[in-house]
Amino acid sequence: MPPAEALEALRLMAWLSPGYPVGAYAYSHGLEWAVEAGDVRDEASLTAWLRDVCERGALRNDLILAAQAHAAARTSDGAALVAVNDLALALAPSRELHLETSQQGRSFLDATRGAWPCDALAALAEELPGPVAYPVAVGLAAGAHGMAPEPVLAAYGLAFLQNLVSAALRAAPVGQAAGTRVVAALAPRLAGLAEAAAASDLDALGAATFRLDLGSFRHETQYSRIFRS
């Protein structure tokens, strides 16, 4: 692998690693309520729940939004970037899920501007002084740095999935070996979702995870909880 490609791969792994300072560990995307309600109770139900999130819920939309933010960054189109971000924030169905994406997005953008600065990123980030959706921040940074979209989208999907599996290990009766099997089972689907998102436009956005959305409302008043969403 040429040094430039190796450096790009290392940058991507750093950005989407659990150690990047975005606070992903604090969010379960409604999984904590799904455990409380009995929807997620073992490896099979966790796999089914996560498959729906990936294919019919937020992850599919996130990948499309990240791809559109990446395209806007590659063409230095600040107006398009702002429009994508506004739409991404509006798509969050509850207060907690809005916090989940906006807090991580702002943290990611600030950390990346500080550690991996570049002129294009600095200029485009000025277009987003307020809340920033997480997929938009990732797409913006990758596009500003000239990174290819498909690997970024696939890596984002894997990071999203692994974070929710990590949440399941803390909230549900699912062990580490089972969690690893869940990731392995769903990883091939992530590659397909990333490829499709790279070729999609905003008209392809849509979700059908109503029980998860309603659960995120109920999580706001859940008596005992360890996650912010």
Curated annotation (Swiss-Prot):
Disulfide bonds: none annotated. PANTHER family: UREASE ACCESSORY PROTEIN F. It is found in: Cytoplasm. Belongs to the UreF family. It comes from Methylobacterium radiotolerans (strain ATCC 27329 / DSM 1819 / JCM 2831 / NBRC 15690 / NCIMB 10815 / 0-1). Keywords: Chaperone, Cytoplasm, Nickel insertion. Required for maturation of urease via the functional incorporation of the urease nickel metallocenter. UreD, UreF and UreG form a complex that acts as a GTP-hydrolysis-dependent molecular chaperone, activating the urease apoprotein by helping to assemble the nickel containing metallocenter of UreC. The UreE protein probably delivers the nickel. InterPro entries: UreF, UreF_sf. The gene is ureF. GO terms for cellular component: cytoplasm. This is Urease accessory protein UreF. The keyword Cytoplasm applies.
